[in-house]
Amino acid sequence: ALVLLAFQVQADPIQNTDEETKTEEQPGEDDQAVSVSFGDPEGSSLQEESLRDLVCYCRTRGCKRRERMNGTCRKGHLMHTLCCR
């Protein structure tokens, strides 16, 4: 399912008020948070539960600690790494 995600990701800045992210390095010009969409408007409850707290970034230089690579994403016409935690 996450491989499918790589082709459907659209860049969309997201603000996170989580205390953990305040102490970590914030996304800069090279990193953008993205929203995740699977195309099925109804979705499945299992899918919704597992993705509820998923935060992904489209990164140009690879994933940071506590993130894992979940595919690729686009910024304009360039492909980058999709990193989620």
Swiss-Prot record:
GO BP term, example: defense response to bacterium
Chain segments carrying region Disordered: 13-48
PROSITE patterns xref list: DEFENSIN
Function recorded in the entry: Probably contributes to the antimicrobial barrier function of the small bowel mucosa.
Expression sites (tissue/organ): Paneth cells of the small bowel.
Name the record gives this protein: Alpha-defensin 14
Family the entry assigns: Belongs to the alpha-defensin family.
Propeptide: 12-50
Superkingdom of the source species: Eukaryota
UniProt keyword annotations, A-Z: Antibiotic, Antimicrobial, Defensin, Disulfide bond, Secreted, Signal
Subcellular location: Secreted
GO cellular component: extracellular space
Family matches, as SMART domains: Defensin_propep, DEFSN
PANTHER family listed in its UniProt record: ALPHA-DEFENSIN 1, ALPHA-DEFENSIN 1-RELATED
